[in-house]
């Protein structure tokens, strides 16, 4: 593909070389190919003094800006080209450049000020099939310029990408898109082999919970995977739905449960007589962070019966300082008037 591109570049240059600005552009292009960026820049500056509106020179300066890692300047150059010649395609060659770094930066520049032709959707769809993961990741980030209807299929496609960073980006952006229809795909990503991907899938699932109906999370409560169950229960609790409470309480009582802190925070949203005893028990958790959260939660719940426990923890010299401080704060909360 890239050998064909080289031939295309050569043909375009030969065609333009019949013009004086074309010859300067060709010379600058050769310098860029040789890595002589400073000399190429000087050549282009000389050319612009003679031909300030030259598209050929602007195209080479766009290339120079990409090589210099300055997509913002490249985007500005592309806009200048399009103002002079609206039918031009300033990104056609950069998007086919042999260098993945240039293709990636071209996508970034394209997204800063996307032209109408070719369509942004077609450009990003093609970039998502690029053999280099850097380019695919950049194309996923650039889906912000698309409508939700256009972006969601590309993001879901990226959840299956061979590159874990691309999958993680897709998981994060599915949450940012605020589209509850992505919930099933995100639940499947909780099984991803990479922890970074799983972390972003979890975060997006919880972010989407405020936009979704409980029914979107209920099937996951029946999953054989414990992580899937817990995340579904956390999401339901954010909707003040207690149908996952048993799972939250079990996770809080599990010394190896990695979601104990979040389960304490979520369980207190549910009006259920089993919650207070479970939160009280969490004040003796082996993890000081869990104990702190549980103490503050009891204070916020105005659990007067826990006052002796709080005082005991506050005066316990063997307890970590942050836990004693949390107990003191919980006692302060108990002394405050009960919200009506």
Model regions and ranges:
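Core register positions within helices of long alpha-helical scaffolds
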Residues: 64, 77-80, 109-112, 142-145, ...
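Amphipathic alpha-helical scaffolding segments comprising HEAT/armadillo-like alpha-solenoid repeats
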Residues: 41-42, 53-59, 72-75, 83-95, ...
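N-terminal leader/linker segments that initiate helical-solenoid repeat arrays
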Residues: 14-89
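Alpha-solenoid helical repeat scaffolds
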Residues: 56-60, 90-93, 137-141, 172, ...
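Short inter-helical turns and helix N-cap capping residues of alpha-solenoid HEAT/ARM repeat scaffolds
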Residues: 98-99, 131-132, 162-163, 193-194, ...
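Bacterial N-terminal signal peptides
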Residues: 6-15
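Alpha-solenoid HEAT/ARM repeat scaffold
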Residues: 59, 72-75, 104-108, 137-138, ...
């Amino acid at each position: 593909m890239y050998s064909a591109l080289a031939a295309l570049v050569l043909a375009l240059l030969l065609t333009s070389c019949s013009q004086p600005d074309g010859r300067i552009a060709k010379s600058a292009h050769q310098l860029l190919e040789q890595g002589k960026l400073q000399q190429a820049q000087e050549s282009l500056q000389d050319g612009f003094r003679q031909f300030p509106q030259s598209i050929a020179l602007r195209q080479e300066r766009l290339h120079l800006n990409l090589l210099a890692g300055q997509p913002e300047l490249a985007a500005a150059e592309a806009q200048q080209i399009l103002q002079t010649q609206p039918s031009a395609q300033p990104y056609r060659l950069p998007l086919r450049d042999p260098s993945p770094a240039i293709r990636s930066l071209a996508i970034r520049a394209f997204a800063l000020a996307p032209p109408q032709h070719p369509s942004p959707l077609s450009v990003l769809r093609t970039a998502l099939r690029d053999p280099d993961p850097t380019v695919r990741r950049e194309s996923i980030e650039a889906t912000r310029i698309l409508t939700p209807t256009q972006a969601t299929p590309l993001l879901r496609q990226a959840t299956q990408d061979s590159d874990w960073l691309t999958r993680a980006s897709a998981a994060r952006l599915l949450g940012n898109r605020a589209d509850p229809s992505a919930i099933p795909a995100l639940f499947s990503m909780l099984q991803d082999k990479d922890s970074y991907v799983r972390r972003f899938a979890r975060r997006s699932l919880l972010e989407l919970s405020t936009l979704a109906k409980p029914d979107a999370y209920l099937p996951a409560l029946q999953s054989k995977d414990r992580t899937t169950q817990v995340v579904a229960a956390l999401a339901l609790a954010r909707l003040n739905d207690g149908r996952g409470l048993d799972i939250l309480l079990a996770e809080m009582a599990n010394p190896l449960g990695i979601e104990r802190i979040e389960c304490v925070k979520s369980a207190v949203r549910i009006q259920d007589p089993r919650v207070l005893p479970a939160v009280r028990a969490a004040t003796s958790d082996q993890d000081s962070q869990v104990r702190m959260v549980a103490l503050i939660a009891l204070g916020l719940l105005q659990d007067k019966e826990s006052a002796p426990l709080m005082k005991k923890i506050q005066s316990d010299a063997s307890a970590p300082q942050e836990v004693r401080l949390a107990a003191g704060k919980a006692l302060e909360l108990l002394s405050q008037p009960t919200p009506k």
